[in-house]
Amino acid sequence: AAGLGWRAYPLHGCGFQTLMKQILKKVRTFAQENELFDPGQKLCAAVSGGADSMALLRILLELQPEFGYQLTACHVNHGLRGASADRDEAFVRGECGRLGVPLRVFHPADVGFAVPPRAGENWARKLRCACFDVLHAEGITTVAAAHTATDQAETLLFRLARGTGLHGAAGIRPKREGFCHPLLCLTRGETERFCTGCGQRWVEDETNDSDAYARNRLRHGALPALRSANAAAEENLARFCEKAARADAYFAQKAEVLLEDAEVLLPQRLPAGAVYAMQKEEPVWALGPLQEADPLLLEAALHRLVSPVRDAEEKYVRLLCTLVEQGSGAVQLTEAVRFWAGGGVLWVEEAVE
């Protein structure tokens, strides 16, 4: 039951050996295809104590000899769940000690955070990012997170419901600078079966049972409904994300060329705001090439402009698309950043601090 702490150790058997080989083969192939690991790489597994992260730790231990990375682990105690959080920390400390994996534990105060009265998911995410920044600064090459194909499916459904474009539909990427996700090829059911088969305990986070969070409502409602229609629904959704990622990469390359061309083909007379932007060495883009581009390519180009400023949700990209089509006006993206169009060009105005 949720919150009780862990599952009992099961017996080993021939079925486990087959299961372990199958899962290790899937992760090995996925890691090779996406070039996740390198010899000598300093790899740190982010371990919460749940089934996914404990499966990640055990799988990385098994694959360590053939890939040659240096494996450590980290655990972030957010301080939000009282005794349950302390129980999870103690559990992870014990398991890493038993497995011989060096562990780094973080508390909010370690990275200058204080727990606010109503700390939510965004605060917890920022805390983890701050902890990972410390690891990277101390020499960790890559943090390995335990996101699975089930997480990928949930992410896709959540983004589609909120409104997303091709970039968002690509979901969680197998790797990005400083991070990798080796278990995107496995479902949550597979990580639990792997742990059960190899006798690996895990802790249960009781907040996963609460429907107070939108992602949990998807997990408890939408995904079971999709599985009833097709048992492979999670894998199929994750596979769609892979295709979306490839398409997004293709359009991103084309979008970069489009923006480069638009920076060159500027009219001779520019609005005062665009002149000022250029004096500050900020880019200015000709509207003509943008207006003539395929709508999908335009969206990809504008996504590249939005993403450094704020989360590139579909609504902000659509606002910029409308601005480009109209050829005049302004879109306020944040308190400090505004996009302007006029005089045949598009430019960015940033507030002076």
PLM regions and their residue ranges:
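AMP-forming adenylation/ATP pyrophosphatase catalytic core
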Residues: 16-52, 72-76, 108, 127, ...
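Core alpha/beta nucleotide-donor-binding catalytic domains of modification enzymes
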Residues: 19-224
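Alpha-helix boundary/capping and short turn/kink residues
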Residues: 162, 166, 188, 227-231, ...
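Mid-to-C-terminal catalytic subdomains of enzymes
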Residues: 198-235, 239-242, 246, 341, ...
